[in-house]
Amino acid sequence: MSKTIATENAPAAIGPYVQGVDLGSMVITSGQIPVDPKTGAVAEDVSAQARQSLENVKAIVEAAGLKVGDIVKTTVFVKDLNDFATVNATYEAFFTEHNATFPARSCVEVARLPKDVKIEIEAIAVRR
């Protein structure tokens, strides 16, 4: 049995999907673009965009009663792999700040993302 996750601390879905799904032992987030849920703003800088996407993922995971340390897999979609080092630095800092081990991860370059943002991140977390 799955349960829809909804929180005001992450942006509302911009299509026919939910922010996340709680499967009981596992939480799966939809891809999070770097929209500030309070203002709707998107930063220009890829580092700030990466941080906001991660904060949005965190909000969904926390809405399900889990924490950053429960994330076991992420997929990172970037518009330009030349931003890889910058994204990595932001990603590393985020997980380090939350005293979390790094999850498994895939990172791919894509042609375009919604709202023409530079990054989108989705995650899987497990209830331990």
From Swiss-Prot:
It is found in: Cytoplasm. Accelerates the release of ammonia from reactive enamine/imine intermediates of the PLP-dependent threonine dehydratase (IlvA) in the low water environment of the cell. It catalyzes the deamination of enamine/imine intermediates to yield 2-ketobutyrate and ammonia. It is required for the detoxification of reactive intermediates of IlvA due to their highly nucleophilic abilities and to avoid they are captured by anthranilate phosphoribosyltransferase (TrpD) to generate PRA, an intermediate in the alternative pyrimidine biosynthetic (APB) pathway. The keyword Hydrolase applies. SUPFAM superfamilies: YjgF-like. One of its GO terms (biological process) is response to toxic substance. It is an enzyme of class 3 (hydrolase). The record marks Y17 as: Stabilizes the substrate. The record marks E120 as: Important for catalytic activity at high pH. The lineage of its organism: Bacteria, Pseudomonadati, Pseudomonadota, Gammaproteobacteria, Enterobacterales. Its EC number is 3.5.99.10. This is 2-iminobutanoate/2-iminopropanoate deaminase. Pathway: Amino-acid biosynthesis; L-isoleucine biosynthesis; 2-oxobutanoate from L-threonine. It comes from the Bacteria. InterPro entries: RidA, RidA_CS, RutC-like_sf, YjgF/YER057c/UK114. It comes from Salmonella typhimurium (strain LT2 / SGSC1412 / ATCC 700720). Belongs to the RutC family. Keywords: Amino-acid biosynthesis, Branched-chain amino acid biosynthesis, Cytoplasm, Detoxification, Hydrolase, Isoleucine biosynthesis. It catalyses: 2-iminobutanoate + H2O = 2-oxobutanoate + NH4(+); 2-iminopropanoate + H2O = pyruvate + NH4(+). Disruption phenotype: Cells lacking this gene appear to be compromised in their ability to synthesize isoleucine. Mutation results in the partial block of at least one step in isoleucine biosynthesis subsequent to the reaction catalyzed by threonine deaminase (IlvA). Mutation is required for the dependence of the PurF-independent alternative pyrimidine biosynthesis (APB) pathway of thiamine upon the oxidative pentose phosphate pathway. Homotrimer.
